[in-house]
Amino acid sequence: RRSVLMDSGADLISYGMGEHSILQIAEALQSGLPVEEITYIPGTVYKCKDLSRAFEPIVLPSYEEVSSNKHTYADSFAVQYRNTDPFTAKPLAESYGTRGYIIQNPPAHPLSQQEMDDVYDLPYTDTWHPMYNAKGGIPALKEIKFSLTSNRGCFGGCNFCALTFHQGRILQTRSHESILKEAIKMTKDPDFKGYIHDVGGPTADFRQPSCQKQLTKGVCQNRQCLFPKPCGNLQVDHTDYVSLLRKLRKVPGVKKVFIRSGVRFDYVVADKSPVFMQELVKYHISGQLRVAPEHVSDQVLHYMGKPSHQIYQTFLREYDKANEATGKKQYAVPYFMSSHPGCTIKDAVKLAEYVRDLGFTPEQVQDFYPTPS
């Protein structure tokens, strides 16, 4: 498919989370600037006849080239992936022949904690749009209505995940005060039964950037924070998350605070302190914890940018020990992925045999299919 901007007839697209760019667009329009002149805002995409407005752009393969050659498409995607960091990204240009170019400006900078708090302090109705009333609402809302977002972004960097394109690899967090304020608001909802279903984000237990360098120089372009092993500069610390969960447990009207999914098991294994694992098992699991090892073949995991199967096994041993110490019998339910590029029949059989030996039938398996992010 062509760019959404080319097909939709829109003048401008705001991509990513959009809070910074949408305000800058509004200010530009309010000042009387014609929309075709708004070509300078990070986190936006615009159309133009030539490259005169783009500052030192990287010219990607044309639309015609990527739509006719899958290897060229992959090359273009790789360039786009390397330009997802707001500190180091360059403008990207894709030619549409006689129709001109699509120019993507670098991503907007991450929000500060105060800005995150301001976003979540807006007067949301916490329900579906009225247009859905006639159809009985949106059933899926029940799953998330009493969940709390504590962070945004993820430095996990899994190769199959589109999160880097949407929220970036630099972690952004809300303050404890902001999250507690929302929890107190939840307790006043007539449908609230005392259970907070989730506290987290793309990765539940990330509460600070992976290292201080990210805040001023951006993320490393050609290496990951956790793969193939944790970076020496990685700050592994669950202290802030544990503190937040303790405060939430004390909110009047809250019976239980659950973490149902999103725990990054290799980050937990890398933490030298056992406190998070102990309190996770003791207070925050409703019978089972969903985790995402994705596969059991180390070769496939390497292609995915995920930790080795041995790391997952280490996590399971520590999880079982913590359950035994607290007198609980709780389960870790794995997410697996089929059809990933590089996964051979032999790898698939190995995964099937592993699942068979676990003695249960997975209810959820993600089947990989390649799509643009």
Regions found by a protein language model. Name each.
Residues 72-147:
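N-terminal [4Fe-4S]-dependent radical SAM core
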Residues 185-333, 337-341:
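Conserved SAM/AdoMet-binding glycine-rich loop
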Residues 11, 119, 154, 179, ...:
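Conserved, mostly hydrophobic/aromatic
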Residues 275-276, 340-356:
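Catalytic cores of alpha/beta
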Residues 167-195:
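Conserved alpha-helical substructure of the radical SAM core
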Residues 135-162, 195, 369:
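N-terminal pre-triad scaffold of radical SAM enzymes
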Residues 1-97, 104-105:
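Glycine-rich beta-alpha loop elements in corrinoid/cobalamin-binding modules
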Residues 116-117, 123-128, 138-139, 149-153, ...:
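Structured mid-domain segments that build the active-site/substrate or prosthetic-cofactor binding neighborhood
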